[in-house]
């Protein structure tokens, strides 16, 4: 595995790989790698000959008061994990290399980015869209793999590449969970041992919703209210949002329809830690118990 920090050097490598007729896939991360990230690499390998992982804690996607300074950065550990996973190139630029002096241009997202996460994290998705656009131009992949845990981000990136005519296939990867259902996340390390136990209430809420749909309940507002009650009954939990949304538009929906794909989104604060999760609810298969 080669480690590259210079964007122009990475561009040259990617161009050379393409000239050899090989397929390229990219997995974008902020480091603090876990099994969820490794699953993205595994999926990337299925669609490509060469896999690039990007490792960059992007400052422009952190809102004021968020955890930019304390975000975990175990670089040597991440290098070992990436190499063990079979990554060919690890692109790990500095902030100065990605946003040099005089940098002025950014990507502004539309209505899709104004709801849910966008409403609670000012400027977040504009920062995501800007860095993803830059990384796609640097790595020149045929496919890019993103986790479904950040479902709204995935939808925005799909919109981004469609709107800007970026020639790349965006592939969504299933959420990887702990044995007790908690979605894998680099921020889980912030949880105390007691908070970690209580954090399973998010998965419990998702499973409750699936069970209610399986019973035949069609009123999604009612189910969302039940999930909210379940979560707020857990010590230390406050809710940013619980919402059923159309998977493509992220507009709220109120009535179940097994012919469509929709998701239940959760954003919950547990102590000082903010957790997000989601689950597909809009297919007959998704009604199966957790």
Curated annotation (Swiss-Prot):
Residues forming the catalytic site: 37 (proton donor)
EC number: 6.3.2.1
Domain of life: Bacteria
Binding site for ATP: 30-37, 147-150, 176, 184-187
Molecular function, one GO term: ATP binding
Catalytic activity line of the entry: (R)-pantoate + beta-alanine + ATP = (R)-pantothenate + AMP + diphosphate + H(+)
Transmembrane segments: none
Keyword Repeat carried by entry: no
Positions with a binding annotation for (R)-pantoate: 61, 153
Binding sites annotated in the UniProt record for beta-alanine: 61
Compartments reported by the entry: Cytoplasm
UniProt entry keywords in alphabetical sequence: ATP-binding, Cytoplasm, Ligase, Nucleotide-binding, Pantothenate biosynthesis
Biological process per Gene Ontology, one example term: pantothenate biosynthetic process
A Gene Ontology cellular-component term: cytosol
Misc note: The reaction proceeds by a bi uni uni bi ping pong mechanism.
NCBIfam families membership: panC (TIGR00018)
HAMAP family with a match to the protein in the record: PanC
Cited function: Catalyzes the condensation of pantoate with beta-alanine in an ATP-dependent reaction via a pantoyl-adenylate intermediate.
Protein name stated in the entry: Pantothenate synthetase
UniProt source species: Chlorobium chlorochromatii (strain CaD3)
């Amino acid at each position: 595995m080669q480690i590259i920090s210079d964007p122009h050097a990475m561009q040259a490598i990617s161009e050379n790989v393409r000239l050899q007729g090989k397929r390229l896939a990219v997995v974008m991360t902020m480091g603090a790698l876990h099994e969820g990230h490794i699953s993205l690499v595994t999926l990337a390998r299925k669609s490509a000959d060469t896999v690039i992982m990007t490792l960059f804690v992007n400052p422009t996607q952190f809102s004021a008061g968020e955890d930019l300074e304390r975000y975990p950065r175990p670089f040597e550990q991440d290098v070992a994990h990436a190499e063990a996973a079979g990554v060919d190139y690890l692109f790990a630029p500095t902030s100065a290399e990605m946003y040099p002096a005089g940098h002025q241009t950014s990507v502004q997202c539309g209505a899709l980015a104004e709801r849910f996460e966008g409403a609670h994290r000012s400027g977040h998705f504009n920062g995501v869209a800007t860095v993803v656009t830059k990384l796609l131009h640097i790595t020149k992949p045929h496919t890019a793999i993103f986790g479904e845990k950040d479902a709204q981000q995935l939808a925005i990136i799909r919109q981004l590449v469609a709107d800007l005519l970026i020639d790349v296939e965006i592939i969504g990867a299933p959420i990887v969970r702990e044995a007790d259902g908690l979605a894998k996340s680099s921020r889980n390390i912030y949880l105390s041992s007691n908070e970690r136990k209580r954090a399973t209430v998010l998965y419990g809420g998702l499973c409750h919703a699936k069970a209610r749909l399986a019973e035949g309940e069609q009123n999604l507002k009612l189910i969302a209210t039940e999930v909210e009650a379940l979560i707020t009954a857990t010590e230390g939990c406050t809710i940013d949002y619980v919402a059923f949304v159309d998977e493509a538009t992220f507009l709220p929906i109120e009535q179940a329809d097994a012919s469509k794909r929709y998701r239940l989104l959760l954003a919950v604060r547990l102590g000082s830690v903010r957790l997000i999760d989601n689950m597909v609810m809009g297919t007959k298969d998704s009604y199966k118990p957790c």
